[in-house]
From Swiss-Prot:
GO biological process, one term: pyridoxal phosphate biosynthetic process
Name of the protein in question: Pyridoxal 5'-phosphate synthase subunit PdxS
Annotated active site: 80
Lineage: Bacteria, Bacillati, Chloroflexota, Chloroflexia, Chloroflexales
SUPFAM superfamilies given in the database record: Ribulose-phoshate binding barrel (SSF51366)
Pathway field: Cofactor biosynthesis; pyridoxal 5'-phosphate biosynthesis
Top-rank lineage group of the source organism: Bacteria
Assigned keywords, A-Z: Lyase, Pyridoxal phosphate, Schiff base
UniProt cross-references to PROSITE patterns, sorted A to Z: PDXS_SNZ_1 (PS01235), PDXS_SNZ_2 (PS51129)
Species in which this protein is naturally found: Roseiflexus sp. (strain RS-1)
Pfam families, per database record: SOR_SNZ
InterPro entries in the record: Aldolase_TIM (IPR013785), PdxS/SNZ (IPR001852), PdxS/SNZ_N (IPR033755), RibuloseP-bd_barrel (IPR011060)
Described function: Catalyzes the formation of pyridoxal 5'-phosphate from ribose 5-phosphate (RBP), glyceraldehyde 3-phosphate (G3P) and ammonia. The ammonia is provided by the PdxT subunit. Can also use ribulose 5-phosphate and dihydroxyacetone phosphate as substrates, resulting from enzyme-catalyzed isomerization of RBP and G3P, respectively.
Binding site for D-ribose 5-phosphate: 23, 152, 213, 234-235
């Protein structure tokens, strides 16, 4: 079968723009997410907060669970593969998954190589902390990006840091001449053509969502106002007191991110948010955002 072109895959990811993608671990949660207005769900055996708490090696989810979630909803279904584990990605493609997330939330399988995403028909989403990581992933074939944040913490600070880093670097590029762009591309180890394209257009060549620590409607609106194209919510919904209501509220806040009155209204009476973790209290070797290169 002919491989889809990268442009086609980028177009598929564009269709999710402005939406919320939710982590789910059961078909019932997937249905709650769909009813709340999620544009896609991420099928997982454990949400990031549980992966962080339980430790051990985190791998691709059981295909049976992924297929059960796929059958439960009509919206697109994503699933995670380990960084560099192209066989997990091949399995997910064979299962008919709509998007594959090469994710630092799982334990990396290869400490030198990311997956060559051009070899797959399915669009990939990858995490990034800065413009260099973003453009290196695009060069490998990623059709969609997201901030890494610090998953499973309920703490939005790292997602904010990564979003601001990407957009401030894009603004810097726009003031550079050709010689400076060449040097900059070399320094961030990204292809010059991609760097030049970003400098000319003032934006990334693919959609960029926020992920990692988003727990409230206000968190979602904050990242949208910073310039992201949509949000991933992992542990923040189903680790909270009233998941269905919080899911609807986060969708509303993402849609109406520039309307404080609406965000204030949907934020009322949501029950207990997930218990968060202070980033400085996490041992350095347990930081998920550090995975990948």
């Amino acid at each position: 079968m002919d491989k889809s072109t990268w442009t086609t895959k980028v177009g598929l990811a564009q269709m999710l723009k402005g939406g919320v993608i939710m982590d789910v671990v059961t078909p019932e949660q997937a249905r709650i997410a769909e009813e709340a207005g999620a544009v896609a769900v991420m099928a997982l055996e454990r949400v990031p907060a549980d992966i962080r708490a339980q430790g051990g090696v985190a791998r691709m989810s059981d295909p049976e669970l992924i297929l059960a979630i796929k059958e439960a909803v009509t919206i697109p279904v994503m699933a995670k593969a380990r960084i560099g584990h192209f066989v997990e990605a091949q399995i997910l493609e064979a299962l008919g998954i709509d998007y594959i997330d090469e994710s630092e939330v799982l334990t990396p399988a290869d400490e030198e190589h990311h997956i060559n995403k051009h070899k797959f028909r399915v669009p990939f989403v990858c995490g990034c902390r800065n413009l260099g990581e973003a453009l290196r992933r695009v060069a490998e074939g990623a059709a969609m990006l997201r901030t890494k944040g610090e998953a499973g913490t309920g703490n939005v600070v790292e997602a904010v840091r990564h979003a601001r880093a990407v957009y401030s670097e894009i603004r810097r590029l726009q003031s550079m001449d050709e010689d400076e762009l060449f040097t900059y591309a070399k320094n961030i180890q990204a292809p010059y053509e991609l760097v030049r394209q970003v400098a000319e257009t003032g934006r990334l060549p693919v959609v960029n969502f926020a992920a990692g620590g988003i727990a409230t409607p206000a968190d979602a609106a904050l990242l949208m106002q910073l310039g992201v194209d949509g949000v991933f919510v992992g542990s923040g919904i189903f680790k909270s007191g009233d998941p269905a209501r919080r899911a609807r509220a986060i969708v509303a806040a993402t849609t109406h991110y520039n309307e404080p009155e609406i965000i204030a209204e949907v934020s009322r009476g949501l029950g207990e948010a997930m218990v968060g973790i202070e980033i400085s209290k996490i041992p350095h070797d347990q930081l998920m955002a550090e995975r990948g290169w």
